Amino acid sequence: AQITLTNKASYTVTPPAQANAADA
């Protein structure tokens, strides 16, 4: 849940579960 607008582009590098949770 530490995905920010700046990390939005790098969210793909993070675990899908965490990325999805932050995106949801």
From Swiss-Prot:
Residues passing through the membrane, by range: none
Cysteine pairs bridged by disulfides in the record: none
Protein modification: Glycosylated.
Keyword vocabulary terms for this entry: Apoplast, Disulfide bond, Glycoprotein, Secreted, Stress response
Subcellular locations according to the entry: Secreted, Extracellular space, Apoplast
Induction field: By cold shock.
GO cellular component, one term: apoplast
Domain of life: Eukaryota
Primary localization class, coarse: secreted
Similarity-based family: Belongs to the thaumatin family.
Subunit text: Homooligomer; disulfide-linked.
Identification of the protein by name: 33.0 kDa cold shock protein
Species per Swiss-Prot/TrEMBL record: Arachis hypogaea
